[in-house]
Swiss-Prot record:
FAD binds at residues 4-33. Involved in the biosynthesis of the osmoprotectant glycine betaine. Catalyzes the oxidation of choline to betaine aldehyde and betaine aldehyde to glycine betaine at the same rate. Pathway: Amine and polyamine biosynthesis; betaine biosynthesis via choline pathway; betaine aldehyde from choline (cytochrome c reductase route): step 1/1. GO terms for molecular function: betaine-aldehyde dehydrogenase (NAD+) activity; choline dehydrogenase activity; flavin adenine dinucleotide binding. InterPro entries: BetA, FAD/NAD-bd_sf, GMC_OxRdtase, GMC_OxRdtase_N, GMC_OxRtase_C. It catalyses: choline + A = betaine aldehyde + AH2; betaine aldehyde + NAD(+) + H2O = glycine betaine + NADH + 2 H(+). The keyword Oxidoreductase applies. Keywords: FAD, Flavoprotein, NAD, Oxidoreductase. This is Oxygen-dependent choline dehydrogenase. The lineage of its organism: Bacteria, Pseudomonadati, Pseudomonadota, Gammaproteobacteria, Enterobacterales. It is an enzyme of class 1 (oxidoreductase).
Length: 556
């Protein structure tokens, strides 16, 4: 089998590339996905409110676990990643958050990455998006990904939480992806107008999968990339339960889009990575690239949970006897409780003046429950997810075996810097202050978690050690740049090799301020033009907010 391009991984970036590259009818593409199809009849991945379900099994989730995390009481922590067409966009929380403009401007300060500035990237965010209220300087009106805005009157807790943030002295913003990210406001979601999850399988592949020049193989577990000298010339994979490898050749390029955990694994198995690590497993060295699998970053978050004194939370939706009605409303009308992910309000703040742009993110949820659906509080409640955004802690992903089915060693080194502890202490104390504003007086009952007895630095630190969880935002393991630990250049081409690019969240040099999915899709769109040799879209001229030393919050 021969193709122009072979794409490994049908996730948030891979599906963008598959769709854009096959717009040219003369270009042939093979898209390999280790998981299965995105079954449209499966409410677990299609109903926004069911977002906890795909994380519970292994049909749609790789369900990786970390090594014991040394600064988290040696907990082995969850590291869920999407499996199936759509990748992590098939199982994520559907928050459409792009990050802060200064994240990208910060990338662009690296020599060779100048064209990754916010204004260079904004046209690609717009190209990918159809926002339900129409386009403007910041948002697209005819892209493949449906974005739904929060509508007034959904739940009084959303507005009360935003108002509480404002009463605490923080800014209000109408659009967390618009002129000003900093502040509290409604949150956009990747949900279709019919109340379905807008994964990249739905948005992109639906328009491309019938093209004769696109071949999609599911249940295709990539074993390794085939090289001829320093040139990538094909891919070998295992189909289904078969132990006999299948191979295909790429006339132009192999495009690795397997995500921040799997992309470095595949490179390492293929002979690209730290020579020392590869020697351990007798893998013939193709190219010594010490940065492969290093620079691993993530967002850590914790929940502050409160009783709700009024019966306005989503608690009744957790009762089995209410679920048939909710399911029917969603199935037949695309409306009701099932049609939202219920992360409809949030915010970004600076916890201290020394941060030039926000370093803390909030998601509000009108029910008290763990992200994966466990430990639901048996009463009306609400919670606030809070976490730091640009931790200095760095980890790694390293293979433990040549067997593609064997999970790698994943270590994030969460909370390994004093800055991490300071940010979380600040975040908990600021959150309590926000929660005690007048806007929440009629709703706020007792603090369920961490609980009012948890006050000193030592008590807060111990709570974080035992209860902070991943926000499922791993990135950075094949970072873009030109220093000795960089893996790819500014166009995603792997240093020292030919015919091989990495296009996914692993190339982010530094994690962004917010959820990763929207930016991963943008990276796919921008790289698709680079791969095709097309001129970049014209730079945006939109304005954007920079704090420039303004106070963190207004004096009361």
């Amino acid at each position: 089998m021969q193709f122009d391009y072979i794409i490994i991984g049908a996730g948030s970036a891979g599906n963008v590339l598959a769709t854009r590259l096959t717009e040219d009818p003369n270009t042939t593409v093979l898209l390999l996905e280790a998981g299965g199809p995105d079954y449209r009849f499966d409410f677990r991945t299609q109903m926004p409110a069911a977002l906890a379900f795909p994380l519970q099994g292994k049909r749609y989730n790789w369900a990786y676990e970390t090594e014991p995390e040394p600064f988290m009481n040696n907990r082995r922590m969850e590291c869920g990643r999407g499996k199936g067409l759509g990748g992590s966009s098939l199982i994520n929380g559907m928050c459409y958050i792009r990050g802060n403009a200064l994240d990208l401007d910060n990338w662009a300060q690296e020599p060779g990455l100048e064209n990754w500035s916010y204004l260079d990237c904004l046209p690609y965010y717009r190209k990918a998006e159809t926002r339900d209220v129409g386009e403007n300087d910041y948002h697209g009106g005819d892209g493949p990904v449906s974005v739904t805005t929060s509508k007034p009157g959904v739940n009084p807790l959303f507005e009360a939480m935003i108002e509480a943030g404002v009463q605490a002295g923080y800014p209000r913003t109408d659009d967390l992806n618009g002129y000003q990210q900093e502040g509290f406001g409604p949150m956009d979601r990747t949900v279709t107008p019919h109340g379905r999850r807008a994964s990249t399988a739905r948005g992109y592949l639906d328009q491309a999968k019938s093209r004769p020049n696109l071949t999609i193989r599911t249940h295709a577990m990539t074993d390794h990339i085939i090289f001829d000298g320093k040139r990538a010339v094909g891919v070998e994979w295992l189909e289904g339960d078969s132990t006999i490898p299948t191979r295909a050749t790429a006339n132009k390029e192999v495009l690795l889009c397997a995500g921040a955990i799997a992309s470095p694994q595949i490179l390492q198995r293929s002979g690209v990575g730290s020579a020392e690590l590869l020697a351990e497993f007798d893998i013939p060295l193709v190219h010594d690239l010490p940065g492969v699998g290093e620079n691993l970053q993530d967002h850590l978050e914790m929940y502050l949970q409160y009783e709700c004194k009024e019966p306005v939370s989503l608690y009744p939706a957790l009762q089995w006897w209410n679920q048939p009605k909710i399911g029917a409303e969603w199935l037949f009308g695309g409306t009701g409780v099932g049609a939202s992910n219920h992360f409809e309000a949030g915010g970004f703040i600076r916890s201290r003046e020394e941060f030039a742009w926000p370093n803390i993110q909030y998601h509000f949820l009108p029910v008290a429950i763990n992200y994966n659906g466990s430990n639901a509080v048996k009463e009306h409640g609400f919670q606030c997810h809070v976490g730091s955004m640009r931790s200095p802690s760095r980890g790694h992903v390293r293979i433990k075996s040549r067997d593609p089915h064997q999970h790698p060693a994943i270590l994030f080194n969460y909370m390994s810097h004093e800055q991490d502890w300071q940010e979380f202490r600040d975040a908990i104390r600021i959150t309590r202050e926000i929660m005690h504003q007048p806007a929440l007086d009629q709703y706020r009952g007792r603090e369920i978690s961490p609980g009012v007895e948890c006050q000193t630095d030592e008590q807060l630190d111990e709570f974080v050690r035992n209860h902070a969880e991943t926000a499922f935002h791993p990135c950075g393991t094949c970072k873009m740049g030109y220093d000795e630990m960089a893996v790819v250049d500014g166009e995603g081409r792997v240093h020292g090799l030919e015919g091989l690019r990495v296009v996914d969240a692993s190339i982010m040099p530094q994690i962004i301020t917010g959820n990763l999915n929207a930016t991963t899709i943008m990276i796919g769109e921008k790289m698709a033009d680079m791969i095709r040799g097309k001129d970049a879209l014209p730079r945006s001229t939109a304005g954007y907010y920079v704090a420039n030393g303004r106070p963190v919050r207004a004096k009361k």
